[in-house]
Amino acid sequence: MRVLITGGAGMVGSHVAELLEARGDEVIIVDNFATGRPEHLLNLRTQYKFEDSIANESLYAKLSSQFLNIDAIVHTAASFANGNDWSDHINTNVLGTALITRLAQKFNCRLIYFQTALCYGDNPTIQPVPLEYPRQPMASSYAISKTAGEFYIEQSGVDFVTFRLANIVGPRNLSGPLPIFYKRISAGEKCVIANAKRDFIDVRNLATVVLQAIDGRGNGAYHFSSGKDVQIIDLYKKVVSAMRLDFEPEYDFQENAAGGPPSILLDPTRTYSDFDMPTLNSIEETVSGAISYYEKFGVTREVTHLKKN
């Protein structure tokens, strides 16, 4: 099987690529390295690595001419690093997704897409949120653009699976609270802890389910989540423990320091029905895997999709 992975140097894309190669599949990587990192590709054998933006129509032409067939597309590429960058969100998450969807139409192949839980807004009235809950992504430019991309896929007629995600963390996680905590603690800086909860789930668990989708399992939209949330302060304490510090770092606690909703829980019932869900890694395993990665490769910057006022 030949699988194209956009954002292949990112956290999700690189883990999926490694699992595909481990079972003998051929992988094509596309990444512009805006947030993906070259070291995430070190374990891959593939010679097909395109450093390009998915918003470039020339990439569409290049892939169309170079490959006679592509059996599946795993579309993880997204613009999220700057919550205020509307133009890049539109170019990458809307136009880029439309072009990738056209590519799936050309090759008549399955498309796997990844959506943010903020597609439901910042204060859904039902918890856990059911799949049929109305999409109203007004909380951020990122959510609006990702949802626009999802709508294009749905009206395109391609065979697709969309995973609407809880907070995916673990090795190679470079956005959100986990790498921020590690970076600030390592620098001797105070962390700011929000009075909020999030559903944290390991990227390695997600990657195994994505492989099932590549192989034809499922159809349409799914929640990838544990259905349980964790206080941000508890995640912080797990990070401190995993760093094996001989002191207790100071932190500031604020009601809603990071912005965003106090919690969004996603109902994973349909996912458990249609996929062979793995035993989910514990939060301790997930944090430990992330810290091991940071100790080896570092954290270069703090990344969030939330708007900065």
What do these predicted regions represent?
Residues 93, 142, 146:
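Active-site YXXXK catalytic motif of short-chain dehydrogenase/reductase
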Residues 75, 99-141:
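Conserved Rossmann-fold NAD(P)-dependent oxidoreductase catalytic core, especially the SDR/UDP-sugar
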Residues 3-23:
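N-terminal Rossmann NAD(P)H-binding glycine-rich loop of SDR-like oxidoreductase domains
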Residues 125-127, 139, 151-211, 238-240:
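NAD(P)-dependent short-chain dehydrogenase/reductase
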Residues 82-96, 131-138:
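Short alpha-helical oligomerization interface
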Residues 6, 30, 73-77, 111-117, ...:
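SDR active-site strand-loop-helix element
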Residues 189-309:
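C-terminal substrate-binding subdomain of Rossmann-fold SDR/epimerase-dehydratase oxidoreductases
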Residues 55-92:
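NAD(P)H-binding glycine-rich loop region in Rossmannoid oxidoreductase-like domains
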